[in-house]
Amino acid sequence: MIIGLGLIGGSFALELKKRLQYTVVGIDKNPQHLQEALALGIISEEIDYSQIADADLVLVAVPVNRIAQVVNEVLDHVGQNTLVMDVGSVKESICKEVAQHPRRSQFVAAHPMAGTEYSGPQAALYDLFDGKVMALCEVEKSNWKLLDRALDISKALNMRVKMMSPTDHDLHTAYVSHLSHVSSFMLGKTVLEIEKDEAQIFDLASTGFASTVRLAKSHPQMWTPIFLENKTNVLKALTEYIKNLENFKHLLETDQADAITQNIKEANYIRKILK
């Protein structure tokens, strides 16, 4: 069962059907998403919470500010052998809010490190998770048999599992994921504010510009809650980023060519990590 039939939930549904031959049913409070998911064959049937007890797996793929509430509600209805997973890109707040539920052990806090800038059921992709990382948090609090099932699902989707604490997860994702979205959003906003001629933007934009602002097409209803839920870490990342931007601005204003070159060389090291 998938709750939330957008990009991630829909892609998971496609993977579960093709790789594990699951019968996938779904819930989404957006009627249009439900109809699209049914029409596209992402789910076979719409159901409600009364049928959760019969599910082997319930995947919660709603916006991050609603995940804890939905997980707690799902845990109220699950059968003894039901695995509940989420896919939120912020983990600490979710884990804290689910911690006291009597059936906490049936929950595996997960984050598939994959996505695109598109949203909704029509954005769902088979193989979206292929070769990507599945972050699992607080695994020591999950029932080991259900955790094994989560690991088996991750393996079947050809994902690389990384276990970590919610605190570490949220800190690292602020730098490698959330900050890049802020940067892309604000770059897009800056260009739109300064370059009023949309035709010029389209005609002169290089592939470098297009790839840099690609994330600016991401859905605000998804990303606003992420920034707010991970506010402390995103602010830390932004502070460091702004410090580097201010330093680069100073070097440019004072014509420090060697220092500019050195800054670029230092940044180039990232390609050795991201081969």
Features from the language model and the residues they span:
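Hydrophobic Val/Ile/Leu positions in short beta-strands of Rossmann-like dinucleotide-binding domains
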Residues: 1-2, 60, 136
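NAD(P)+-binding Rossmann beta1-loop-alpha1 motif at the extreme N-terminus of oxidoreductases
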Residues: 1-49, 53
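Hydrophobic/aromatic beta-strand patches that form the interior of the parallel beta-sheet core
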Residues: 25-27, 47, 85, 108, ...
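Short beta->alpha hinge that forms the Motif I/post-I loop of the SAM-binding pocket
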Residues: 29-30, 62, 87-89
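Rossmann-like NAD(P)-binding element
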Residues: 49-85
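Rossmann-like NAD(P)(H) cofactor-binding subdomain of soluble oxidoreductases
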Residues: 72-122
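Internal alpha-helical scaffold of NAD(P)-dependent oxidoreductase catalytic cores
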Residues: 126-211
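Interdomain hinge/lid region at the active-site interface
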Residues: 198-267
